[in-house]
Amino acid sequence: DMHEPSGDFERLALAIEKQWNIQGLKADLAIMRRLQPVLRKGDWKVTVAVYQSHDGATPRILDLWPGFYEGSIYGLAIDLGSTTIAAHLCDLRDGSILASSGLMNPQIRFGEDLMSRVSYAMMNPGGDVEMTKAVRNALNYLADVIATEGGIDASSIYEMVFVCNPVMHHLLLGIDPVELGQAPFALATSGAVHITARDLEVTSVNVAAQVYILPCIAGHVGADCAAVALAEEPNKSKDLVLIVDVGTNAEILLGNESRVLACSSPTGPAFEGAQISSGQRAAPGAIERVEIDPITKEPRFRVIGRDAWSDDPNFAELIKDTGVTGICGSGIIEAVAELRMSGLLDAGGLMGSAEQTGTNRMIPQGRTHSYMLYDGTTQGGPLIMVTQGDIRAIQLAKSALYAGARLLMDEMGVDHVDRVVLAGAFGAHISPKHAMVLGMIPDAPLDKVFSAGNAAGTGARIALCSKSARAEIEATVGLIHKVETAIEPRFQEHFVNANAIPHFTDPFLLLRAIAPLPNVSFNTQSGGGEGGRRRKR
């Protein structure tokens, strides 16, 4: 219309306002450059992808197509963990998951745990930049991989939602995490973050893709814990629920509709197979389940990817494609718990000798003994042992986990909880009974211990698909009270008491009613043979 001075964008914005009540629409220059050809190709009919934030920020056009576009648009929900990066590819029309994928966090080469990475940044000028580049490269790769698995073009990904612990949060954003390594553990920002994928140098997705990062709760309690709270909703529970997100850095929530507490506990990577002599990440061929006969002391096990136990006559044939390659986190937890229940391991965490235990599977190694779980050396495979060092690594990890939970219970003024929820991608595979035998979690009825799977990833997916959920979690984190384990003297007391298996002072009466905990002690001198003298404590 020669008599209508408005530009094509202004007319489009007015039409969208009239039809969809979306006001104040904006568009980047890249959209402006495409606008007129698209409008004319579609004979002034157009489909527009609009990003409209829950907080009233300016709505923006992300993409447009001539005529009626019937294709889908997609989003990524990403749990950016210290050890692994897990992602869900979701159809933004209905929230369905097209594909899920993950990879190891490449920052592991700079340090296996969070404080090691903070130290790397402190000690090496530009170290934070190196770690930021590594994780961003991994995200580009992961986006391409998951798009291929989902059968879509990565350029159809228009939004990414991240949940992560505070150190990963800062490194993702390119913020030096040094302040998180020293009191008062100050975050550069604790609120939700709205940016673009370009800001994070994630270029494999759509050029206009938006990024939302959930808010952090406090200095050591991050957006991953907020995502768990969003998924599990302890603030809406009438029962007192303890939620433990098991990982390299455990996040713990305790609460009900009256009050919610949170803390972070530095468990380290042992639960994920690291720092274990035959440890590996969960993958086909890794031992994931273990049982030890309390009479014969003989083991049997299962590996990831096969349902058969190792005492199955056809086991060798069934695992010929994968073999037995090592032991993952759930496997080492069950192995240590089974050693305790079969009387091969005492409450203090010491393993006995062959003479003390009556089994030649106890192999002397210097001044300690190890339990031979599997010997595949005659077929060119590995010798998989549970060593005294493995036991100690698990003791330290589980003590940190228990101490964090117990600290929250002290703050709440309770000795028992109504429900326990094991969360995290790894938490989904933990046997509640074996976790209780180890003393990873406080004593509770086994039928009140549940697995929530990767609750942080679930929370990320909820936030990806729901604007109201984003508003809800932003309000909820302000009501969660954070307990700082690093400066709380009772944490160390609880940690020391939790070194025993299951515990030095807590009798674990509910556990003892269903699981044998033999009253054995190997902290003595034993006769003859290498390794006969036990280490004293």
Describe each region flagged by the PLM.
Residues C164-E179, G255, R361-P364, V414, ...:
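Short glycine/threonine-rich loop-to-helix capping motif typified by GTGT followed
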Residues T203, C216-A231, Q395-S399, V449-E484:
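Glycine-rich phosphate-binding/hydrolytic loop that grips phosphoryl groups
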Residues N256-L261, Q275, R406, D410-V477:
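Catalytic phosphate/nucleotide-handling subdomain of diverse soluble enzymes
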Residues P106-T148, Q275-I276, P284-D293, A393-L396, ...:
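N-terminal phosphate-binding loop and adjacent alpha-helix
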Residues I85-L103, Y158-E159, V163-G191, A335-E338, ...:
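Carboxylate/His-rich catalytic cores and anion/metal-binding grooves
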Residues R340-D410:
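A contiguous, well-structured pocket-lining segment that forms one wall/lid of small-molecule binding clefts
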